[in-house]
Each structure stands twice: as C-alpha cells, then as structure tokens.
C-alpha cells in the first residue's frame, strides 16, 4: 500500500441521510437539505488521504486524530465515474459516491474544507492524476448553501466517537460522532475567501445556542437622502392659514363707505353714461370708476347749500371716506311734501345731463385712497341752473341718511341691484 496524497483538513462535513439511488447518479434524487449536515472542525486533527493498493484499487480515507476512519471508500483504479464524483471550488472539495454496504444502492455525500490554496491544489492534482471526475461547483450553489460562518469553539468541548473497523467495497466505516458544534451549515465554500477579502463579501451569521458565532459588523454608510417633502417645522413649509372673514352685512348707508376702503375697482362704462351724474344717477349707477388717489370730481353748489351740507356732515354716520352725497335739486320742503315732484326733477336733470354728455368727452372720476381731496377738482354745471363750489377738502365728519330716503331706495330696483353687485364684489375680495 502506497500513500499517494495526504492533506490536512480544516473542516469535515457529512450528510446524515443517504439517498436511495437504484440507478446510480441517474436516479431521481431530492436536493440535499441544509439542516441535515453535520460538521466537525475543532479540537481534533483531520486528514484526507488517497492510498494506492497493490491490487490496483484506490482507497480514500478521512481520518480523525490519525486513528478513526470517518470515510473509507474502496474503488477500482481507472474508469470509476459511475461510482464516485467530485466537485471543487477553492477551498472546498465535495464528494458523492454510491455505496452498497447495506444492500440497496445508496448515494452518500461528504465535503472537506482545506486550510489554504496550496493544500487545495495538491488534492486536486492528485485526484486528476488518478482519473477521477472533478467538476467545478457553480457559484449559485455556493450562494444558496452558504448561510453562516462558523469559528472554532473554545477548548473543553467533548467529542465522542464510536469507532468501527468494519470495511467493505465502496463503503465507509460505520462511525458516529456527536459534538456541540454541529449547526445548520452545509457548505463553507466561500469561508476562506471571505476571510481574505472581508470587504468584498459579508458573512451572515445565524444565532445558535452554545456556539460562538462569528459576527461581522456591517459598514455604517451614511446615505444622503433627499426628502421629497419639506419639514413642517421649517419656515418654508409652514403656511399661514387665514381664517374665513365674518359675513359682511352691507346696508345701503354703508355701501359707499365699504367701496372707499377697498382698492378693487370695476371697469368704467363712460361711453354709455357721462361720468358727471346727478344725485339719483350716482346712487343707481352699476359701475365704479377706476381708483386713483388725488383726484375727484367736485360738484359746485350754492353757498346756501354748502352751509346745509356742512351741518349735515356733522351728523352723518359715514367716516373719513370720499363718498357721493345724495341731494335733490328741489327744495327740501317740496321733497318732503311730494316725492313725485322730486322724481320728476331728477328725471329732468338726468335727461339734461345725458344731452350734455353727448358733446363732452369722458372724464374719469378718481377717488383718493386717503380720504382727502388734493386740491384738484373738476367743475360740473347741472343744466345751467346751479353751480356750487365745495372747497372743503377733508370730509371727516359723519353723515346721516333719513329713514324716508332709505325706504325710497329700498323700493328702487336699480339701486338694489347695484347694492347686490357691490356685496358680491366685496365677498369675493374677502374670500381671496
């Protein structure tokens, strides 16, 4: 007997459940299960040996502590690819062979993990020289079977073996061993490579009782995450939610005051109506002239009426806004006695004004925002009858509208339509 090759083994793995294979390697076999493997690697000495016999046979042994045979395979030298096959991927060599030790043909598996590339290459060259079938293991198999990295446990762990000496053709010794370092790990094909290149491969460890597990920390890579939504605490993300304004109750006496406080103006229709209108026309008009501070149309009245106006200004309820005051061209006593005479007079004045507006160019009525007249004024002659100059620029006094006038205006459909439009405009402004 001649020892052809002998290498040291770092780890030995054995599949505990043989597969029934009546047709040899061509039989339909279930894939091996990871939890059916047993491993031995610590507190012992393991060797893989290839021996040549004088009878032309080959012996393959896996020896524990130079005395116990864990694998004892006897094969004819030469064409034996139907009896044994090897798969290799540095630093692991896997073997499967057909055994008839217990009668039916069974397929058994084992695998060895060599300590370095030198021992791995020595074993591969020896097997190739003896015409054994060696196949390169697929990478996908290694990735599916390697689930953990196992380190040697401390001294003091006991390993019990039942040594057996029964040998037969194509069979191994009936050796059983128990150890506390048996875990659910089949292949360590990438174990050594992971140790040499820790940065290229990360080892995944499974928790197991009574075993020191090799733990490898993952690198804490800081990722710059760009958030698609802004933080609600940042000033750019916080939005001021305006509360809904209270409903505005617009009364006929407050319409002109509300218009003066807003900066929104409706388009002018001066092409159809003259901008200088009488008192009744100003109340019933449906549009407001564009706003421009500093200019306003002034109606000139006699001095007697100016004095009456100044007295009435002190008792009105309108404040600090330039508004158009409603005045009749007839005497107040006549208006109080007969409202029909007032309407007739208003109609005459409106007709005369329309006739004058045909030949006069359109003029813009401009309302100052600050509530004062800046000295610029336009003079309007109403039918050539009355011309009054109002020189008081500041109208800060309050004004009063009589109940009778309010009742009359509430009955006026055109005036009420205009009030409704003003209310609609104001509501839209507050909604914005």
Curated annotation (Swiss-Prot):
Keywords: Chromosome, Meiosis. Its main location: nucleus. Residues 333-373 are annotated as: Disordered. It comes from the Eukaryota. Pfam families: Meiotic_rec114. Belongs to the REC114 family. Required for meiotic recombination events; not required for mitosis. This is Meiotic recombination protein REC114. The gene is REC114.
């Amino acid at each position: 007997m001649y020892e052809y090759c002998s290498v040291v083994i770092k780890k030995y793995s054995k599949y505990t459940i043989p597969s029934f294979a009546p047709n040899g390697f061509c039989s339909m076999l279930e894939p091996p299960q990871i939890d059916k493997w047993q491993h031995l690697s610590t507190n012992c000495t393991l060797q893989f040996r290839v021996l040549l016999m004088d009878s032309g046979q080959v012996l393959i042994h896996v020896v524990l502590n130079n005395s116990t045979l864990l694998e004892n395979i006897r094969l004819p030298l030469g064409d034996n690819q139907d009896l044994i096959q090897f798969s290799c991927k540095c630093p692991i060599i896997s073997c499967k062979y057909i055994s008839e030790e217990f009668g039916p043909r069974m397929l058994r598996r084992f695998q060895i993990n060599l300590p370095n590339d030198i021992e791995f290459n020595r074993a591969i060259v020896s097997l190739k020289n003896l015409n054994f079938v060696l196949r390169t293991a697929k990478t996908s198999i290694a990735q599916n079977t390697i689930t953990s990295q196992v380190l040697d446990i401390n001294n003091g762990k006991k390993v019990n073996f039942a040594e057996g000496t029964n040998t037969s053709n194509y069979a191994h010794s009936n050796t059983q061993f128990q150890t506390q370092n048996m875990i659910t790990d089949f292949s360590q094909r990438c174990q050594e490579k992971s140790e040499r290149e820790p940065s290229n491969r990360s080892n995944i460890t499974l928790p197991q009782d009574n075993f020191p597990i090799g733990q490898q920390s993952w690198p804490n890579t800081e990722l710059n995450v760009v958030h698609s939504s802004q933080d609600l605490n940042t000033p750019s993300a916080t939005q001021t939610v305006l509360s809904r304004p209270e409903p505005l109750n617009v009364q006929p006496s407050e319409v002109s005051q509300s218009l003066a406080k807003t900066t929104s103006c409706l388009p002018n229709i001066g092409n159809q109506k003259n901008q200088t209108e009488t008192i009744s026309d100003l109340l019933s008009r449906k549009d407001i002239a564009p706003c421009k501070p500093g200019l306003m149309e002034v109606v000139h009245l006699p001095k007697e009426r100016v004095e009456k106006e100044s007295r009435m200004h002190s008792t009105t309820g309108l404040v600090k806004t330039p508004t158009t005051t409603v005045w009749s061209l007839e005497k107040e006593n006549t208006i109080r006695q007969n409202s029909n005479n007032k309407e007739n007079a208003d109609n005459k004045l409106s007709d005369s004004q329309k006739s004058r507006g045909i030949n006069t160019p359109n003029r813009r009525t401009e309302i100052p925002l600050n509530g004062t007249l800046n000295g610029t004024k336009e003079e309007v002659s109403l039918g050539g009858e009355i011309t009054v100059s109002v020189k008081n620029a500041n109208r800060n006094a309050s004004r009063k509208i009589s109940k009778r006038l309010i009742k009359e205006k509430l009955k006026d459909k055109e005036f009420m339509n205009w009030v409704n439009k003003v209310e609609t405009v104001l509501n839209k402004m507050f909604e914005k």
